[in-house]
Amino acid sequence: MKLIIATRKSQLALWQSEHVAQILKNTHQIEVLLEGFKTKGDVLLDSPLAKIGGKGLFTKELEESMLRKEAHLAVHSLKDVPSFFPRGLVLAAVSKREQSNDAMLSQNYKDFLSLPKGAKIGTTSLRRKMQLLLLRPDLEIISLRGNVNSRIEKLKNNDFDAIILAMAGIKRLNLDKQVNFVYEFSKDELIPAASQGALGIESINDEKILELLKCLNDENALIETSIEREFIATLEGGCQVPIGINAELLGDEICVRAVLGLPDGSEILKDKRMIKKNDFKGFGESLAKEFIAKGAKELLKKAESMI
């Protein structure tokens, strides 16, 4: 049997797809091929993600290729995957999670506190912008899109004092070797995006394919990301609004951190809970409902009007 993986052509996307392909080859001794596609999010680089549609920007073309039967599966950064799937496609697996926190890369400043007043920080994420301004209202947050290499080049050219990336991507591509300083934010400083660091394997809804993909599943990653995705789905939030949610398994307990608010950090709702591992089902939804009772929907509408 031969499996075809639909993939974006960026360096990180190719790494992720090749990583999954290798596991499938080693486990089942089958042929696995990669088929590259450009998504809307890869082409429209001049506008912030929030203004051109948020989630689905990096998945739609890959999903269409599967629906046309040109590919059997696609490997995504799970944080880019919408909560609901087109008919005929399913979330087949969530693989073992890489570090889920964010990090600051800089050529001249070793940590966040050493940044000078008014420092220029590159990130396109409204979630990061909100939390960075909450910590340091003096910073100038500038939209930064494009592939990872172009972002690093802009940092080296002194267009920015620092840029913010996910630690997962930094580790997968060894980006720490390309810059002078990497400062890892704690999850209390910067609450990550839902499913950050996890790979989501989307596939056609076919029993034989789903059976082959079972080997990619990681139980801990499934538990953590199910809480996070449930929270986002209940709030009906996506990339276009500033929401952070992270569930972290610590033995038989789970630490859940959540935040949402306005992009400028002037108004936020934030919470941190410890729950028993056995109580994870439905917790994302119940936490979201608590946020809604505190005015989360109104705050997110206000956030959308500010974009």
UniProtKB/Swiss-Prot annotation:
A cellular component term, taken from the record's GO annotations: cytoplasm
Metabolic or biological pathway, per its Swiss-Prot or TrEMBL entry: Porphyrin-containing compound metabolism; protoporphyrin-IX biosynthesis; coproporphyrinogen-III from 5-aminolevulinate: step 2/4
Reactions the enzyme catalyzes: 4 porphobilinogen + H2O = hydroxymethylbilane + 4 NH4(+)
Keyword list, A-Z: Porphyrin biosynthesis, Transferase
Stored PROSITE patterns: PORPHOBILINOGEN_DEAM
UniProt-listed SUPFAM superfamilies: Periplasmic binding protein-like II (SSF53850), Porphobilinogen deaminase (hydroxymethylbilane synthase), C-terminal domain (SSF54782)
Keyword flag Hydrolase: no
Cofactor(s) in the UniProt record: dipyrromethane
Co-factor note (free text): Binds 1 dipyrromethane group covalently.
Modified residues (S-(dipyrrolylmethanemethyl)cysteine): 239
GO biological process entries: protoporphyrinogen IX biosynthetic process
Entry's EC annotation: 2.5.1.61
Keyword check for Iron: no
Miscellaneous remark of the record: The porphobilinogen subunits are added to the dipyrromethane group.
Quaternary data: Monomer.
Function: Tetrapolymerization of the monopyrrole PBG into the hydroxymethylbilane pre-uroporphyrinogen in several discrete steps.
Entry similarity comment: Belongs to the HMBS family.
Listed name of the protein: Porphobilinogen deaminase
Organism: Campylobacter jejuni subsp. jejuni serotype O:6 (strain 81116 / NCTC 11828)
Gene that encodes it: hemC
